[in-house]
A protein has these predicted regions:
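Long, contiguous binding/interaction regions
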Residues: 1-69, 73-75, 84, 101-179
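Short, charge-patterned binding micro-sites
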Residues: 79-87
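Short cationic amphipathic helices and targeting signals
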Residues: 89-97
């Protein structure tokens, strides 16, 4: 039996930039309204395809882990939003807790969970904006291929996008095939 999967069209750079602007506007609205830190979750999805069953399942794991983190720490969640978009899934939480501690826990989750490297958990503070990893003494994200700083490899296009996509897909497939 053959199962045909529709081929998804890639997302244009203009669409990605517009989605990023809309996300920043939502974040700013929440920061103004709640005056509390906001957690923004997106996925690391190299290539043109940003919405697939693989990525949706990965986002599902990320959502579960983030909700568990908030629950375990008994942090008050003032609002939560989840969007399934052609440009990739996005989630926001507004949390009544100090931003630096939230970021420290989010960075640990990104570093310790087998899929965490594919999650981009940003923490934005109403007073000081984005809380960076470096401000907490955390290391920069590493490249999925060569372990150099990810930003440098991404900007220089050091690795073929097909190689990076294959690595991401393998990480996801390995996670869901475990046990």
């Amino acid at each position: 039996m053959t199962i045909a999967t529709p081929v998804r069209a890639g997302v244009s750079l203009d669409a990605l930039l517009a989605a990023k602007e809309r996300r920043a506007a939502r974040q700013a609205d929440w920061l103004t309204h709640y005056q509390q830190p906001v957690i923004s979750l997106t996925l690391v999805t190299p290539g043109e395809i940003k919405d697939s069953l693989r990525y949706r399942n990965t986002m599902g794991v990320a959502l579960q882990m983030c909700d568990q983190l908030l629950w375990e720490n008994r942090w008050q969640v003032l609002d939560r939003q989840l969007l399934w978009l052609p440009t990739g899934p996005e989630a926001l939480w507004c949390v009544a807790h100090p931003a630096a501690e939230i970021k420290a826990h989010c960075a640990e989750l990104e570093q310790t969970h087998p899929l965490g490297r594919l999650w981009d958990l940003d923490v934005i503070c109403p007073e000081n904006g984005h809380v960076g990893r470096q401000s907490l003494g955390s290391h920069l994200r590493r490249c999925l291929i060569c372990d150099e700083p990810a930003h440098a490899c991404s900007r220089s296009r050091k690795h073929p996008v097909e190689q990076v996509v294959a690595r991401v897909e393998k990480m996801i497939d390995d996670w869901f095939a475990r046990d």
